């Protein structure tokens, strides 16, 4: 049994953004949720998030999670922020885990190691990391596992600055925590209350303070846009490695972007520059071409999305293909062996087995029957200025190039629509519909007009 407090009240001025720092996205979800999910993995008895700057937005992001919220009205430092949780946890005996909402790489395994030290008798345990360049971090002084102190860089003599072990900002405490917090002073230039001051307070009360050295990568926090990009890069490398280990082929993996919510099957091939977002699910043997973007899209086994295609909320069945340069909007469903080619846009439409729309077409709010061919430049005119209307095209129909089907309208099975037609009435099964002005040839007109006759 333990309680976990996540500190998420900071303003994040160096981000230069109106969005609260902890809500900046990493691979499609707010940074704070990474810290929250790591905390939940250990099944805490109580989970408190301390919010402050932009707190209303932060609380919205926490909706649906089993958390309690404490408010830090004034941002007076990390120790002051933690003290705001006392009202919720006053009767909780401990131990307590404390992490930061802007440190999203911490693993449950590392947090468990901190908690174990306190359960084994330490009063306080803190996570440390050895950094190649510790500039800007407080240095850890210790003997063995015992922490003697934390020296801020500005106060450190040269021999202390040479130390590369730093405080990573994650802690475990025993039940003495809130009493100790009340002894923290703000005798510093910023007039703020800092968590590292608890090291000296715990030691003064005869309680052991131990260090747990973690992986340097996990200690990475986010205070700037550059650091945000660095952390996102770490998350991406982990995710790519995980999927390649499960049988996904990535060509130039460092160029591929994907989010944790994406699901991939073995023998999927991802070409350079592919972007996979949201609840995208890609089946076995599928291929995603260079610079294709898939969001909330399903590719069933054997489907292909070719270069520079954008698909949002689409569903491609086995053997279907789209692209290059196609656009599939929400509700686009391509059944088996459908092909949608270059510069074809499909929105809220069902294309049955074997439909071909090779180039330069718009199919919106339509249902197209099995085996039908859609010529170049075909448009389903679905919007009358007030409402959307449906176009229905039967099986094995042929819609000639540059035709416009003005919805609501139906073209029957095996019907033909002549090129360049504007269809405003239903076309019966097996009929030919031609709706265009008859061609006239005026002999000699051009020569006379140009004065060369």
Swiss-Prot record:
The keyword Nuclease does not apply. Residues 226-246 are annotated as: Linker. Residues 1-225 are annotated as: Pyrophosphorylase. It is an enzyme of class 2 (transferase). The keyword Signal does not apply. It catalyses: alpha-D-glucosamine 1-phosphate + acetyl-CoA = N-acetyl-alpha-D-glucosamine 1-phosphate + CoA + H(+); N-acetyl-alpha-D-glucosamine 1-phosphate + UTP + H(+) = UDP-N-acetyl-alpha-D-glucosamine + diphosphate. Binds 1 Mg(2+) ion per subunit. Keywords: Acyltransferase, Cell shape, Cell wall biogenesis/degradation, Cytoplasm, Magnesium, Metal-binding, Multifunctional enzyme, Nucleotidyltransferase, Peptidoglycan synthesis, Repeat, Transferase. Residues 247-453 are annotated as: N-acetyltransferase. Mg(2+) binds at residues 102, 223. UDP-N-acetyl-alpha-D-glucosamine binds at residues 7-10, 21, 72, 77-78, 138, 152, 167, 223, 329, 347, 362, 373. The active site is at 359 (proton acceptor). It holds the Pfam family Hexapep. Its EC number is 2.7.7.23, 2.3.1.157. CDD domains: GT2_GlmU_N_bac (cd02540), LbH_GlmU_C (cd03353). InterPro entries: Bifunctional_GlmU, GlmU-like, GlmU_C_LbH, Hexapep, Hexapep_transf_CS, MobA-like_NTP_Trfase, Nucleotide-diphossugar_trans, Trimer_LpxA-like_sf. Acetyl-CoA binds at residues 376, 382-383, 401, 419, 436. Its cofactor is Mg(2+). GO terms for cellular component: cytoplasm; membrane. It is found in: Cytoplasm. GO terms for biological process: cell morphogenesis; cell wall organization; lipid A biosynthetic process; peptidoglycan biosynthetic process; regulation of cell shape; UDP-N-acetylglucosamine biosynthetic process. Its main location: cytoplasm. Homotrimer. Catalyzes the last two sequential reactions in the de novo biosynthetic pathway for UDP-N-acetylglucosamine (UDP-GlcNAc). The C-terminal domain catalyzes the transfer of acetyl group from acetyl coenzyme A to glucosamine-1-phosphate (GlcN-1-P) to produce N-acetylglucosamine-1-phosphate (GlcNAc-1-P), which is converted into UDP-GlcNAc by the transfer of uridine 5-monophosphate (from uridine 5-triphosphate), a reaction catalyzed by the N-terminal domain. In the N-terminal section; belongs to the N-acetylglucosamine-1-phosphate uridyltransferase family. This is Bifunctional protein GlmU.
């Amino acid at each position: 049994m333990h309680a976990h407090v996540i500190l998420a009240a900071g303003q994040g001025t160096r981000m230069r953004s109106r969005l609260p720092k902890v809500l900046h996205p990493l691979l499609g979800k707010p940074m704070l949720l990474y810290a929250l999910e790591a905390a939940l993995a250990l099944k805490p008895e109580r989970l408190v998030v301390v919010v402050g700057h932009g707190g209303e937005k932060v609380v919205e992001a926490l909706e649906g999670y089993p958390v309690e919220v404490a408010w830090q009205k004034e941002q007076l430092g990390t120790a002051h922020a933690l003290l705001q949780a006392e009202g919720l946890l006053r009767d909780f005996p401990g131990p307590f885990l404390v992490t930061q909402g802007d440190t999203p790489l911490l693993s449950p395994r590392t947090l468990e190691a901190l908690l174990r030290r306190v359960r084994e008798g330490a009063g306080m345990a803190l996570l440390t990391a050895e950094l190649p360049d510790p500039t800007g971090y407080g240095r850890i002084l210790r003997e063995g596992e015992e922490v003697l102190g934390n020296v801020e860089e500005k106060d450190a003599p040269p021999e202390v600055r040479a130390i590369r072990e730093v405080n990573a900002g994650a802690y475990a405490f025993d039940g003495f925590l809130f009493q100790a917090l009340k002894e923290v002073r703000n005798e510093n230039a910023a007039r703020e209350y800092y968590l590292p001051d608890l090291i000296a307070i715990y030691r003064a009360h005869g309680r052991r303070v131990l260090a747990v050295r973690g992986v340097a990568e996990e200690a990475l926090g986010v205070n700037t846009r550059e650091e945000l990009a660095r952390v996102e890069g770490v998350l991406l490398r982990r995710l790519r490695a995980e999927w390649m280990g499960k049988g996904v082929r990535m060509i130039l993996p460092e160029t591929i972007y994907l989010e944790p919510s994406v699901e991939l099957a073995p023998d999927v091939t991802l070409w350079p520059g592919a972007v996979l977002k949201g609840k995208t699910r890609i089946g076995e043997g599928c291929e995603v071409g260079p610079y294709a973007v898939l969001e909330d899209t399903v590719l069933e086994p054997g489907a292909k999305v070719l270069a520079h295609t954008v698909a949002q909320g689409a569903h491609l069945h086995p053997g279907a293909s789209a692209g290059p340069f196609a656009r599939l909007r929400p509700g686009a469903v391509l059944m088996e062996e459908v092909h949608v080619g270059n510069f074809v846009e499909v929105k809220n439409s069902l294309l049955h087995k074997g439909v071909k729309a090779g180039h330069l077409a718009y199919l919106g709010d339509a249902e197209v029957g099995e085996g039908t061919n859609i010529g170049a430049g075909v448009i389903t005119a679905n919007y009358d200025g007030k409402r959307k209307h449906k176009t229905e095209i039967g099986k094995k129909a042929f819609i000639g190039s540059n035709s416009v089907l003005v919805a609501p309208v139906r073209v029957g099975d095996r019907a033909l629509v002549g090129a360049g037609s504007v269809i405003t009435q239903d076309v019966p099964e097996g009929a030919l519909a031609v709706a265009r002005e008859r061609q006239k040839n005026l002999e000699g007109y051009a020569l006379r007009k140009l004065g060369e006759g």
